[in-house]
Amino acid sequence: MTQKNFVELRNVTKRFGSNTVIDNINLTIPQGQMVTLLGPSGCGKTTILRLVAGLEKPSEGQIFIDGEDVTHRSIQQRDICMVFQSYALFPHMSLGENVGYGLKMLGVPRAELKARVKEALAMVDLEGFEDRFVDQISGGQQQRVALARALILKPKVLLFDEPLSNLDANLRRSMRDKIRELQKQFDITSLYVTHDQSEAFAVSDTVLVMNKGHIMQIGSPQDLYRQPASRFMASFMGDANLFPATFSDGYVDIYGYHLPRPLHFGTQGEGMVGVRPEAITLSDRGEESQRCVIRHVAYMGPQYEVTVEWHGQEILLQVNATRLQPDVGEQYYLEIHPYGMFVLADAA
């Protein structure tokens, strides 16, 4: 069954003076999906979020929510909620009052409001915190209160503006899992903004990568990582080693190293291939074309991050710390897993 497109941007452009921040963007978010805007600072992702929210108006184009043109509607008329990086909680109110503030403004009866606040706090693992204040809880708990405040209103669309940026690594991991769990549980159509690739992969059905106001590629996290469409995408989605290659009927040749050609490779002749660090291993045996020299080793806990020189090119790979302990200057033979390669159709 095809999912309904619930949020849609049609030919949307946004200018600030003479500066074009968003250039003719088309974007759809199917009902119940989490779509993440990912890109470097200044790429336009937050501007798109603000356009969907109604905090900015497009210079050109239209915005639809649930089939209705909301281009010129205010944020109050769009039935959306936003979770901010800064939490935006009221310090003079209790947590229960913060969570229930929107319902209070809507005139929800006191008894119903109290019950829904209790339920919302329980959803984010803060049951019994109604009477505490913002300065009595941690940053991670504050972000969960902000999430409860958004969920309690049961919005059509939920927007996330880099909500985990102020949290440490462990809190980010647990909070992103909680966001994804609740988004799927309540089937809320959501748009998420981040510059963190691992965060985008963990929470998203679909990731949209932006650069300089343009969409570079759209796809599932797996597709974007395994089949990047350009040199920019290959490097932005994670570490990537890029090699000139020759493609024949049965093989891929990289610096004389012959690899079985994967079935999905359609290219013939000369081209560029990419290989992720985890698809390269080191061996004590191999052909002369595979010989490499260790140039740098960094211990990363469960693995070593190793830089080797291979045919005059420095490449990055990962080595399991329990299996091999390479030292600078040692020689090994490099092995590439054929199905860890991708072809760059656009090497620009």
Curated annotation (Swiss-Prot):
Keywords: ATP-binding, Cell inner membrane, Cell membrane, Ion transport, Iron, Iron transport, Membrane, Nucleotide-binding, Translocase, Transport. Its EC number is 7.2.2.7. It is a peripheral membrane protein. ATP binds at G39, P40, S41, G42, C43, G44, K45, T46. GO terms for cellular component: ATP-binding cassette (ABC) transporter complex; plasma membrane. The keyword Transmembrane helix does not apply. Belongs to the ABC transporter superfamily. Fe(3+) ion importer (TC 3.A.1.10) family. The complex is composed of two ATP-binding proteins (FbpC), two transmembrane proteins (FbpB) and a solute-binding protein (FbpA). This is Fe(3+) ions import ATP-binding protein FbpC. The lineage of its organism: Bacteria, Pseudomonadati, Pseudomonadota, Gammaproteobacteria, Enterobacterales. The gene is fbpC.
